Amino acid sequence: MTTKPRHPEKVNKPLNPIKKKPDWIRSKLVNSKEFFLTKTIVNNNNLVTVCQEANCPNITECWSKRHATFMIMGDTCTRACAFCDVKTGRPGKLDSLEPVKIAEAVKKLNLKHVVITSVDRDDLDDGGSNHFFEVIDQTRKRNPNTSIEVLTPDFLRKGDAYKKVLEANPDVFNHNIETVPRLYLKVRPGSRYFSSLELLKNAKLVNKNVFTKSGLMVGLGENKEEIIQVMDDLKAADVDFLTIGQYLQPSVRHHPLDRYYHPDEFKELETIAKSKGFLLVSSTPLTRSSYHADEDFAKLQLNRINNH
């Protein structure tokens, strides 16, 4: 019996050798009691995490702090982004019990801040926005003191579906821009740069109190001028929080890594972004959307108060 490939769309792609990681990319290996407790809670509830599915380099550190980013609506994505390690294919039916399972897992982990993301579900009429609403709603009912951050797909061609997510009143609305517009056709072929910008802009118009957030990867072949243009575009969309991290090539079939940025370059990008007026900027090689999200949410709240 042959095993179905995780990325069938990449089977015939040319092989791109993976460059050796520099010393500053090494992630921490922590196998603490808390790590295994987090793993047990996730597994026992049959939950999916982006930590596992996207092969995140920070998983041991985060799980040792009982931080896990839940990925809802299954483990199979309808898009085929060239950078992503999440499985591609035809997803199954939504799990109607998932909202309660997520809420209970948040309670067991005693999370003060939770990040909930999802695969793209282009097969659903609403892109999964109603399911997002239910997950947020159930999580809040069972964990009234937990702040909730969502990392959503773009809801491309789904009209006002995104408004249903905002109706649930998440504390942070995150949608990653991922890369510069020139690289979209190669890196995010199923997405549109300006649609993602519009989503972020509209999110703030629909809910002026929500913190908006977006992430950018570097090392895909972009240049500094293009990165700065993305910063300007995100600021014009009234985005509060920008994250910048190093692209790490998941396999030889994925988009080739152009280069590793030095930590000093990340510092420089952080300085430039801060000068643009973002409420918060996180720019390090291992920065990911949900990395230190709980601490960053506290900083966002403080910075908003101080800016008024």
UniProtKB/Swiss-Prot annotation:
It catalyses: [[Fe-S] cluster scaffold protein carrying a second [4Fe-4S](2+) cluster] + N(6)-octanoyl-L-lysyl-[protein] + 2 oxidized [2Fe-2S]-[ferredoxin] + 2 S-adenosyl-L-methionine + 4 H(+) = [[Fe-S] cluster scaffold protein] + N(6)-[(R)-dihydrolipoyl]-L-lysyl-[protein] + 4 Fe(3+) + 2 hydrogen sulfide + 2 5'-deoxyadenosine + 2 L-methionine + 2 reduced [2Fe-2S]-[ferredoxin]. The keyword Secreted does not apply. Binds 2 [4Fe-4S] clusters per subunit. One cluster is coordinated with 3 cysteines and an exchangeable S-adenosyl-L-methionine. PROSITE patterns: RADICAL_SAM. Pathway: Protein modification; protein lipoylation via endogenous pathway; protein N(6)-(lipoyl)lysine from octanoyl-[acyl-carrier-protein]: step 2/2. SMART domains: Elp3 (SM00729). GO terms for cellular component: cytoplasm. Its cofactor is [4Fe-4S] cluster. It comes from the Bacteria. This is Lipoyl synthase. The lineage of its organism: Bacteria, Pseudomonadati, Pseudomonadota, Alphaproteobacteria, Candidatus Pelagibacterales. The gene is lipA.
